């Protein structure tokens, strides 16, 4: 009996190509069915074709016309927030589940270390690379104390940022901010992304500042360490860059949080780095690795559930 379902990727850029290679190397319940783009000269489409994956340069409409489409159960959308709405509408009409790697956020936010097992929507949003790296830390603090405010700064190599990432900077900050509050548990959130032009390229680095109610620093540090271990299960290159730092914010010197006013308590500062697995781009592109690794974990879970429920579209066609 076959234990894999076929998937397609829309968007043969940096993220889409890295995800394709991950699926082919590490996917437990996934099998590449198609790679979809809009540029016939795309390097990603050419690479997919060399790896015997069906391709089309006619976008979502081309995917629907491919013979293999009737066997596709899951589609990963690695295009743009603007294009995702139409893609999702057409795919949902065919009973295909969608994993959204854009900041469109039509479906619920999913971060594997926080809520992977709880979600089973037909469209799941992978937040952003910065969100995948930093929101688990905010959630770790939230497990111990109420978080008034969380601010994250994601610094990625300019070389690792393709046209899709650059076109979605505004959506990146808004989606990440919303997920800091929704999944991280912060009363207010803020997200900043920095495209670092340094040469040689630096690996992804993230800074997380959290202002919470007073709590025992040791308990927060232990919660963060546990969360880091959870993320490392699917992103081995994820790690703390240095020890967690704590600063008291006394009642007579509160910090003013926009939208909610002055707050005091405990400030927690966490410094992270994410080294990529170098499946496609070099190891400095940890921002790609954490996003595609999270999407792979989500896809494997979707596939298991579809097969267990007997609703996999391509199951009969691909069964051995």
UniProtKB/Swiss-Prot annotation:
Write the protein's name: Acetaldehyde dehydrogenase 2
List, in alphabetical order, the GO biological process terms annotated in this UniProt record: catabolic process
Q: Which SUPFAM superfamilies match?
A: Glyceraldehyde-3-phosphate dehydrogenase-like, C-terminal domain, NAD(P)-binding Rossmann-fold domains
| Pfam families found in the cross-reference section | AcetDehyd-dimer (PF09290), Semialdhyde_dh (PF01118)
Q: Highest taxon of the source?
A: Bacteria
- Principal EC category: oxidoreductase
Write out the catalytic residues in the record: 129
Task: State the HAMAP family in the record.
Answer: Ac_ald_DH_ac (MF_01657)
UniProt lists the family membership as follows:
Belongs to the acetaldehyde dehydrogenase family.
Q: What is its EC number?
A: 1.2.1.10
Q: Which InterPro entries would you find in this protein's record?
A: Acetaldehyde_dehydrogenase, Acetylaldehyde_DH_C, NAD(P)-bd_dom_sf, Semialdehyde_DH_NAD-bd
Catalytic activity, as annotated:
acetaldehyde + NAD(+) + CoA = acetyl-CoA + NADH + H(+)
Q: Which GO terms describe its molecular function?
A: acetaldehyde dehydrogenase (acetylating) activity; NAD binding
- Residues the record lists as binding NAD(+): 160-168, 287
| Database matches in NCBIfam families | ac_ald_DH_ac, PRK08300.1
Which keywords are on file for this protein?
Aromatic hydrocarbons catabolism, NAD, Oxidoreductase
List where this protein forms a coiled coil. Answer: none
